[in-house]
Amino acid sequence: MRGVSAHGLSHEERRQLAVDLTRVLAHYRSILDAYIIEFFTDSLWGTLPHSWQEALDGLNPPQLATLLLGMPRDGEEMRYRSVWPLTLLALKSTACALAFTRTPGFHTPSEFLENPSQSSRLTAPFRKHVKPKKQHEIRRLGELVKKLSDLTGCTQVVDVGSGQGHLSRFMSLGLGLMVKSLEGNQRLVKRAQHLDQELLKALDKMEKRHPKMVQRGPRHRPHHVVQWVSPTTLCEELLLPLERPGQSSARLLLTGLHACGDLSVALLRHFCCCPEVVALASVGCCYMKLSDPGSYPLSQWIAGLPGHELPYRLREGACHALEDYAERLHKAEPGLQTHCFRAALETVIRQVCPELRRPGVQGIPRVHELKIEEYVKQGLKRVGLDPQLPLDLAALQAHQAQENRVVAFFSLALLLAPLVETLILLDRMLYLQEQGFYAELLPIFSPELSPRNLVLVATKTPLGQAFSTLETEDN
C-alpha cells in the first residue's frame, strides 16, 4: 500500500492531515469499534451498507487481499468481478491516501536471501541468540542512530527498555558508540550482561583468526542499569553521563526499539524537558497500553479536534500486522477460520450465560483440524462452562458457512487500522513541533519483517539536507 510521507509535509499540512484523519475515523467508527468475536451476536455483517455486502459477499481470502486491501501478488492484475459502490472504493482510496507510508526508501536485495535465519549484513557474533526479525531491526535502527549521533554531536546513546540488550550490544560493540542501557527487569539485565561477555569472547577469537576482518580499537561494552522509566516523572539515572567528572557536558541521544505503550511517551517527555538530550530515535508499539488520558493526545492541536478520541479497541487494532495478514489471505491459510469459530462460540456463551461477554479464551491448538462443534466444546470448558451442553449443530454449521464474511469484515477493519497508527504518531510529531523542536517519521524496517516499522526522529536543531542520509541504506 502506498501512503503519505511525513517527511516533506509542512507544519500546516500535518495539522490538516490530523483534521482529515479524525473526520475519517469518526465516520467509520462503527467498523473500527466492532469486536470480530461479536460478528454473529451483534449481526455485524448487517451493519454494512447493502451495496458493500453485495460487493464483498463471496470473495475468497486471496481476492480480499488483492481487491480490498489493495495488496496483489507481484504481477497480479486487479480484476473486479462486479462494479464496486463508490462509497466502498472511497473507503479504500482514503485509507491508502491518509496513512503514513510503510515502505522504506531503500531498495537493496534482501539480507535473508541466502539464509532466512541469518542476516548477510551482520557478522556471525552479532547474529547469535538473535531472531531474524530482531537482526534486521537492530541493524537498521543501530545504523540510523549512529548517523544521527554523528550529525548531532552526541557523546552518549541511552537505550531505554533495552530488554536483553541486542540493540545496545550492536551499537556499542559493533558501531563503537558509548551506550547506556536501561531496563526495568533485573532478570533481563543479567541476561544482557551474560550475552555481552559471550560476544566479547567471540570477537576476540575472530580478531585472532582474522585480524584484518575485525575493526581494531577500544571496545566499549554497554553500561547496563536496572531502571524503570516513568512517563510522568524525570529519570535522573537516564541523564547521568558515562564520562568522568571534569569532561565536557554530555550530549545524549535517546532511543527505544519498540518501546511499549507509555515508555515511548516517556522518551518524548525526557527529550523535551532535558537540555542534555539533543536527539531522539524512537520506534513505538503496543498503542493499546497508552494511558488515557495522559499519553494521547499529547499535542494541543489534536486535543482540540472533535472526534480525536481513540478508545482501547481502536488502539489495539492499530497494532495488527497488515502485510502479514494479507500474506495469510493470499495463502488462504486454514487458521483464518479461527475468527469465525470464536464468533460462533460467543453465540453459545451468550445463550448459556448472557452476562458473560467476550471472555478470554486461551489459544486452542490446531483449530484448523477441529470440527466447529469440537472447538465450541473446548472453548466452553476454557471459560468455565459445561462442555457437554447440547449444541445446535445446524446453527453452528450455518455460522461456519459465513467464514468468508467474517474474514471480509475483519479485513475492512484492518484496512482502516493504519489510520489510527498514523494519528497517534502524527500527534507525537505535532507535540514535538509545538515545543519548538524538529520531528520526522521514517519507515525504517521492512514491514513484512517488522510491522511497527516507523521511527520517530527528533532533534533540537534542524538537520536540513543532512536528514536525507538517515533514509539511506549503508553499503
UniProtKB/Swiss-Prot annotation:
| A single cellular component GO annotation | membrane
Q: Which domain of life is it from?
A: Eukaryota
Q: What is its main location?
A: membrane
Subcellular location(s): the record lists: Membrane
Keyword Transmembrane helix attached: yes
Q: Which UniProt keywords apply?
A: Coiled coil, Membrane, Transmembrane, Transmembrane helix
Q: How does it sit in the membrane?
A: Single-pass membrane protein
Record's protein name = Methyltransferase-like protein 25B
Q: Which species expresses this protein natively?
A: Mus musculus (Mouse)
Gene behind the chain? Mettl25b
